[in-house]
Swiss-Prot record:
Gene: OPG121
Residue span(s) of domain Nudix hydrolase: 30-209
Keywords, in A-Z order: Hydrolase, Magnesium, Manganese, Metal-binding
Family statement drawn from the similarity comment of this UniProt entry: Belongs to the Nudix hydrolase family.
Protein name: mRNA-decapping protein OPG121
Its EC number(s): 3.1.3.-
Length: 213
């Protein structure tokens, strides 16, 4: 069952509050971010795992490279093990407990729209870059979703847009190859991420877009 135009569906995770709304068009501006809900040729939903967690990236942006880290403990569960080790190395006092060795920062593939690009050209470029040129697009879906995400950890709001993207590659074509992209460390099936905090709303996004092809 889908949502009608402008109807809003809300999801909440320990970190995020996400509003999902179906819209007619994606606005074109320098701040527009577009993402693809990618479906493989054999029907699997794809998701990317970032090389760096958003929490660690935010900490780095606020710190001098030689400084002692000041880190809220509520951020620790949203970081990679190697990032936690780096924080522990710089701790003046305290310790890090309850590390989740299986944490991954899941994201939809896509990025920021260039002013000279169409929406679909932007997605083709981003998918090519983030997959080390392994992903090629067969066709795009017709439904557009607006995602409004409030990051409760940093009290910031992000707006992005998403559409389905059916690709020519199978899951096996993509899952057994290394990726050297600066942002993405791995591309995998969303079906393998059922224990992730983001799984529920990411699954909803895929179901909305795919079933409305």
């Amino acid at each position: 069952m889908g949502i009608t135009m402008d109807e809003e569906v809300i999801f909440e995770t320990p970190r995020e509050l996400i509003s999902i709304k179906r819209i007619k068009d994606i606005p074109r501006s320098k701040d527009t971010h577009v993402f693809a809900a990618c479906i493989t040729s054999d029907g699997y939903p794809l998701i990317g795992a970032r090389r760096t967690s958003f929490a660690f990236q935010a900490i780095l942006s606020q710190q001098n490279s030689d400084s002692i880290f000041r880190v809220s403990t509520k951020l620790l569960r949203f970081m990679y093990y190697n990032e936690l080790r780096e924080i522990f190395r710089r701790l003046r006092k305290g310790s890090i407990n309850n590390i989740d060795p299986h944490f991954e920062e899941l994201i939809l593939l896509g990025g920021k729209l260039d002013k000279k690009e169409s929406i679909k050209d932007c997605l083709r470029r981003e998918l090519k870059e983030e997959s080390d040129e392994r992903i090629t697009v067969k066709e795009f879906g017709n439904v557009i979703l607006k995602l409004t995400t409030r990051d409760k950890l940093f009290n910031k709001v992000y707006i992005s847009y998403c559409m389905a993207c059916f690709i020519n590659q199978s899951l096996e074509d993509l899952s057994h190859t290394s990726i050297y992209n600066v942002e993405i460390r791995k591309i995998k099936s969303l079906n393998d991420c059922i224990n992730d905090d983001k799984y529920e709303y990411l699954s909803y996004i895929y179901n909305m877009l795919v079933n409305s092809k």
